[in-house]
């Protein structure tokens, strides 16, 4: 009898441990990936054909594999194309899997005559959660355009969010918008544009981060770490990034930091698993509630998304 029951007992224990491990894993929402199809007849405006790493179809079947391998439950796509029809193209592309592809940060040019029309139409789909400021038409005069402010006010009134790509915009720009429109939810992308060199963070950047973080409507994605590194392939040890990450943690705390990868651009610096390992290492000594907020709860709250279903 003992010989018969012993392997059964071991099997029950093994199943129990596996179930326990799965139940205690923290869900992950990746709030920053891009999808596109370079084989479309009309092509794509980004990435360029000269990009040997990124210029290939990047579609749901590719991210499905990445997310399953790395325990990513869901994602918010960020539209990298400046072509307006591509907003709907992405929504249609992912409609077969709404529990994995839960949101889209769209691409519409603020301050243009048709902005309102397109925003009204696209936001009828509840997965359309906001837009990203990427280009800066007019350069330094961009914020002198009254239409820009009217469109930003419209975003706030519609409870749509604003992601900001920190290449064309400064932290000071974000601070100005946040103060003028305190009801607009703003999310700075890619560690607030930090130049990461494996040494103490730039004092000017630190000062700007501390100032902008005083606005409660400003949040920050810890995303794009590999791209912000001054060396490629990107270092895989969290110590290289710790100076900037510590600044963001101290400034924004557990309630206003959000996880994103910037996949597939991450492939320039390393694998998805290597990227995720870096941010997990940084949060390893934080309490579980803070980890849960960073990896998924803050994203749900910021983008106004329903509870996870997978």
Model-derived regions, located:
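Mid-to-C-terminal alpha-helical segments outside catalytic/metal-binding sites
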Residues: 3-4, 26-31, 56-74, 246-247, ...
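Bacterial N-terminal signal peptides
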Residues: 5-14
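Mid-domain alpha/beta scaffold segments of enzyme catalytic cores
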Residues: 21-154, 158, 239, 279
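Active-site neighborhood of phospho(di)ester-bond hydrolases with catalytic His/Asp-centered motifs
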Residues: 29-31, 77-78, 105, 132, ...
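Conserved, mostly hydrophobic/aromatic
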Residues: 32, 90, 104, 155, ...
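Active-site environment of divalent metal-dependent phosphoester hydrolases
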Residues: 36-39, 82-85, 111-114, 136-139, ...
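Catalytic pocket-lining loop regions of alpha/beta-barrel enzymes
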Residues: 129, 142-258, 287, 306-310
């Amino acid at each position: 009898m003992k010989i018969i029951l012993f392997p059964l007992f071991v099997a029950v224990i093994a199943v129990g441990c596996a179930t326990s491990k799965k139940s205690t894993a923290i869900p992950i929402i990746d709030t920053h990936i891009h999808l596109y199809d370079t084989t479309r007849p009309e092509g794509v405006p980004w990435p360029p054909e000269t990009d040997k790493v990124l210029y290939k179809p990047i579609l749901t079947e590719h991210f499905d594999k990445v997310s399953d391998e790395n325990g990513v439950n869901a994602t918010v796509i960020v539209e990298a194309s400046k072509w307006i029809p591509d907003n709907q193209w992405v929504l249609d592309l992912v409609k077969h899997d709404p529990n994995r592809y839960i949101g889209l940060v769209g691409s519409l040019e603020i301050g243009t005559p048709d902005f309102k029309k397109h925003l009204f139409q696209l936001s009828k789909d509840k997965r359309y959660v906001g837009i990203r400021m990427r280009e800066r038409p007019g350069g330094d005069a961009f914020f002198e355009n009254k239409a820009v402010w009217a469109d930003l006010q419209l975003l706030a009134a519609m409870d749509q969010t604003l992601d900001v790509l920190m290449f064309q915009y400064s932290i000071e720009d974000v601070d100005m918008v946040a103060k003028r429109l305190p009801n607009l939810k703003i999310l700075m992308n890619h560690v607030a544009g930090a130049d990461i060199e494996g040494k103490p963070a730039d004092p000017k950047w630190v000062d700007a981060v501390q100032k902008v973080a005083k606005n409660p409507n400003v949040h920050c994605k810890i995303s794009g770490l590999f791209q912000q590194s001054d060396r490629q392939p990107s270092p895989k040890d969290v110590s290289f990034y710790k100076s900037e990450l510590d600044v963001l943690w101290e400034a924004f705390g557990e309630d206003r930091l959000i996880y994103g990868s910037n996949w597939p651009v991450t492939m320039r610096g390393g694998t998805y698993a290597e990227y995720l390992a870096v941010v997990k290492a940084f949060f390893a000594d934080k309490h579980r509630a803070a980890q849960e907020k960073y990896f998924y709860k803050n994203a749900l709250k910021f983008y106004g998304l329903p509870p996870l279903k997978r």
